[in-house]
Structure formats: structure tokens, C-alpha cells
């Protein structure tokens, strides 16, 4: 069974259906609460640009259509991310994902990356592509982060609740930075071109804010 959401222009697949029935005009597909067979993905049209799995999906992603630009693998996915299409710009790795990200495994086209709730792997130098501009680190993440492991392309960086490492010498390209209530350390040596920072209210006297930077207290 499937239905078409005209507002989001997305085909939502709730039960098995033949992919020959999917119009080539469809560019956005969402699998809702099912575990599609691996060969289903091979049959997906190269016209599809947006692919979402809401839950239950936990299969390799090495044979997705080369046209995919946006991929949300859902909350159950916990597989290697090697072999993603070179066209991909947005990747959401959901709640269960906690796999090492190897150097060169993410496509060089990627600009937006969300690492989900359980991700807590070291970010090694070269593991994030030089195209990346937006990075959100999930709730559990508590690994050291430094200028050497983040590409100079990053402009937006968000830390999760458990993160509690020093953040000195972040890339100078960062313009937007967010911390949560869980951060217990002093915040210093911020990028000079920072435009906006979100910090806990108890940190307002413990940080040196660059000139003209907007501060949002939470």
C-alpha cells in the first residue's frame, strides 16, 4: 500500500508494492514502518533524489540510486556508510547508528550531516569530507573534537548533551556554534568570525564572545 503526500510531494510506502508502479516523476520516497528487501533499493528509479526510512530499516546502503541527494536512514540503521552515492548532500544517521566513520567513506558532495542519539565514535582526521558545512553531533557523543578532525568548510556545529571536552582551536570557518546544558567546561578561544553561539545560561560569565557575535542563552 502506498499514498502520495501532495504537500511534501512524497510517495509514502507503507506495505509492499511493485516499483514498476512508481511513476518516474516521483522524486521523493519514504518507507514507513517496514523493512524493504535489499533488492528493492536496486530497483529504485534514478529519478529519486530524496529517500527516507522512518523505522525498521537496517540494510547496507552501497547500492542506492546515483541520483540520491537526501538520505534519512531512520532510527534502526546501524551499518557501515561506505558506498553512498556521490550525489548525496544531506545525510541523517538516526538513533541507533554507532559505527566508525572511515576516511573517504562519506561522499565528497556531502554538506549536511546529522549523527544520531547513540553515536559516540572518535572523529578522525580525514573522516569528514571537505565539502561539509553543517554538522550536528548527537546526545551521547563525548569524544574530543579539534581543528585537525573537522574540515575548514564547516560553518555550523552543534554539540549534544553529553559532550564535555575542551573546544579550543575550532576551525576558523565556524559561524554558528551550539552547546547544551550538559557542557561543564569553560568556553574559550572561539573562532573570531563567529556570528551566533547558543550556550547554557550558567556559562554567560565564563566565555569571551567575539565582537558582533549574537548570544542565545538556553
What are these regions (language model features)?
Residues 11-18, 29-39, 50-59, 70-79, ...:
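Concave beta-strand-loop units of leucine-rich repeat
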Residues 1-5, 16-24, 37-45, 58-65, ...:
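Short, T/G/N/S-enriched strand-turn elements that build extracellular solenoid repeat scaffolds
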Residues 89, 93-96, 105-118, 127-137, ...:
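Intrinsic low-complexity, intrinsically disordered segments enriched in polar/basic residues
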Amino acid at each position: 500500500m502506498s499514498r502520495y503526500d501532495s504537500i511534501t510531494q512524497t510517495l509514502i510506502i507503507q506495505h509492499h508494492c511493485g516499483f514498476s508502479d512508481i511513476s518516474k516523476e516521483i522524486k521523493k520516497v519514504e518507507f514507513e514502518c517496514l523493512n524493504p528487501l535489499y533488492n528493492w533499493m536496486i530497483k529504485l528509479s534514478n529519478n529519486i533524489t530524496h529517500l527516507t526510512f522512518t523505522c525498521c530499516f537496517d540494510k547496507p546502503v552501497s547500492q542506492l540510486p546515483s541520483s540520491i541527494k537526501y538520505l534519512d536512514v531512520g532510527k534502526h540503521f546501524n551499518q557501515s556508510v561506505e558506498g553512498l552515492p556521490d550525489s548525496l548532500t544531506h545525510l541523517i544517521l538516526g538513533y541507533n547508528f554507532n559505527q566508525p566513520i572511515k576516511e573517504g567513506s562519506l561522499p565528497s558532495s556531502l554538506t549536511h550531516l546529522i549523527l544520531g542519539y547513540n553515536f559516540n565514535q572518535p572523529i578522525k582526521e580525514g573522516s569528514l569530507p571537505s565539502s561539509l558545512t553543517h554538522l550536528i553531533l548527537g546526545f551521547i557523543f563525548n569524544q574530543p573534537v579539534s581543528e585537525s578532525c573537522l574540515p575548514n568548510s564547516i560553518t555550523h556545529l552543534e554539540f549534544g548533551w553529553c559532550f564535555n571536552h575542551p573546544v579550543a582551536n575550532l576551525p576558523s570557518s565556524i559561524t554558528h556554534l551550539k552547546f547544551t546544558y550538559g557542557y561543564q567546561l569553560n568556553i574559550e578561544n572561539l573562532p573570531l568570525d563567529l556570528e551566533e553561539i547558543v550556550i547554557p545560561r550558567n556559562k554567560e560569565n565564563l566565555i569571551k564572545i567575539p565582537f558582533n557575535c549574537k548570544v542565545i542563552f538556553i
